[in-house]
């Protein structure tokens, strides 16, 4: 398996991207990595690992650039070069921690959508009390209709099925209340269609339900999804900081911390977003993974692991098959 990595994308590029990629090569003996970036940055890395290939790109799409404009103007950027390699099937997946909007725009323009999907969705995995939950959309589509939400549900169902190894993952529709009549017209219409579908639809879920892991898939528009994602990241960070402050307050709390250190480490690990890799762009014709913009080596390593699992489990073809099998159910 050959994975392409954007070495120039993200807040800590290129150093942490390179470090995470080299670590993945040590850990996974059945992968090759193609690092894409500026020659002056990557030159000399070839000798470090025989399964590492370098592809030079003279441009970088920055986080503050307008996505569509950057994609059209910077054809020799590390991001677009990587997507082109994927289009030509020279690699099996592409991963970037760079500009999210540019990655989505570039993937759409370069690779296109799966037949039957109107809009691709960003699908991160969130840690919960009972395991993990797929959230989609997490920011790609701020305005959605009911048909978009139903399509997100189908893609999320397949993704959770393959990645979590659950035959019938529970699908919930994010809403302001659990009652069927709650929400705007788009959400109400999506509820009716999901209720009629063959998915394991459990109904509406509220924000407070998500951390408890009441379902394996949460469906919403990108505006709401991004707010959920950022809120949960912020809360996890605050809890971690509060625990650290309280447990180091004095000698007695420090002694108590020693007694529960094992449990604290497990909690911290479970709440750490870097443990969950990146978010696939579900609905794109080829495997594209978006790593967190703040990713360091550990997060990049786990995003590569996720990309590998995504390809190994043939998630895209299973999504295509599910879309074809549901047919008219996806037309709202």
From Swiss-Prot:
Cell compartments where the protein resides: Cytoplasm
UniProt main location, coarse: cytoplasm
Protein's UniProt keywords contain Repressor: no
One of the record's GO cellular component terms: cytoplasm
Enzyme Commission no: 2.3.1.274
Sequence similarity: Belongs to the PlsX family.
Quaternary structure annotation from Swiss-Prot or TrEMBL: Homodimer. Probably interacts with PlsY.
Coiled coil: none
First-level EC class: transferase
Origin species: Thermoanaerobacter pseudethanolicus (strain ATCC 33223 / 39E) (Clostridium thermohydrosulfuricum)
The name this protein goes by in its record: Phosphate acyltransferase
Annotated InterPro entries: FA_synthesis, Phospholipid_synth_PlsX-like
GO terms assigned for molecular function: phosphate:acyl-[acyl carrier protein] acyltransferase activity
Reaction(s) this enzyme catalyzes, per UniProt: a fatty acyl-[ACP] + phosphate = an acyl phosphate + holo-[ACP]
Role summary: Catalyzes the reversible formation of acyl-phosphate (acyl-PO(4)) from acyl-[acyl-carrier-protein] (acyl-ACP). This enzyme utilizes acyl-ACP as fatty acyl donor, but not acyl-CoA.
Keyword Transferase assigned: yes
Short name of one Pfam family: FA_synthesis
Pathway: Lipid metabolism; phospholipid metabolism
Keywords for this protein: Cytoplasm, Lipid biosynthesis, Lipid metabolism, Phospholipid biosynthesis, Phospholipid metabolism, Transferase
Alphabetical GO biological process terms: fatty acid biosynthetic process; phospholipid biosynthetic process
